[in-house]
Amino acid sequence: MAARTAFGAVCRRLWQGLGNFSVNTSKGNTAKNGGLLLSTNMKWVQFSNLHVDVPKDLTKPVVTISDEPDILYKRLSVLVKGHDKAVLDSYEYFAVLAAKELGISIKVHEPPRKIERFTLLQSVHIYKKHRVQYEMRTLYRCLELEHLTGSTADVYLEYIQRNLPEGVAMEVTKTQLEQLPEHIKEPIWETLSEEKEESKS
């Protein structure tokens, strides 16, 4: 992005030196002069089959600020389950890498696997001694994220859920931090003792 901006500035200076560069600053207007197209939002420059897009206002903030306070999470537990160990290992690596890029502290542990066995007849019309045993192994990975804001948690969860592989399920448990309500802030026994003193006097 910085290289593109610098290159656009060099091209602009070059054209200003040549003298065939005109700028129209009125809003909503678009001027086309000598292979040059200027718009209020983006500048599109063409010079000898070279195209460069340069944003006009780089200082405007992209993030919107709201008065509403963000949700705080003490813990975010993501349980991932699947049948293939290699897929879970790969997904764990991806999720940890994404968390580190966002600056989130993450811990990973592996709960014990669950094995379900089904004993069935080999065929519907066959003797009882001819049986087959099927086994279904479910492997787990638990990702523990701590001390998150609501917006960070939403971005991270959306990113890892969009890249969830086939045959893998996910459960998310959120532990939210809340303020104590006004009616519980003071202990009840203090208010009861004050009422008894008032009634005695």
From Swiss-Prot:
Major localization listed first in the record, in broad terms: mitochondrion
Keyword field contains Nucleotidyltransferase: no
Family annotation (Pfam families): Ribosomal_S10
GO biological processes: mitochondrial translation
Keywords assigned by UniProt, alphabetized: Mitochondrion, Ribonucleoprotein, Ribosomal protein
Annotated GO CC locations: mitochondrial inner membrane; mitochondrial matrix; mitochondrial small ribosomal subunit; mitochondrion
Keyword Phosphoprotein carried by entry: no
Subunit composition and interactions: Component of the mitochondrial small ribosomal subunit (mt-SSU). Mature mammalian 55S mitochondrial ribosomes consist of a small (28S) and a large (39S) subunit. The 28S small subunit contains a 12S ribosomal RNA (12S mt-rRNA) and 30 different proteins. The 39S large subunit contains a 16S rRNA (16S mt-rRNA), a copy of mitochondrial valine transfer RNA (mt-tRNA(Val)), which plays an integral structural role, and 52 different proteins.
Similarity field: Belongs to the universal ribosomal protein uS10 family.
PANTHER family listed in its UniProt record: MITOCHONDRIAL 28S RIBOSOMAL PROTEIN S10, SMALL RIBOSOMAL SUBUNIT PROTEIN US10M
Name of the protein: Small ribosomal subunit protein uS10m
Organism annotation: Homo sapiens
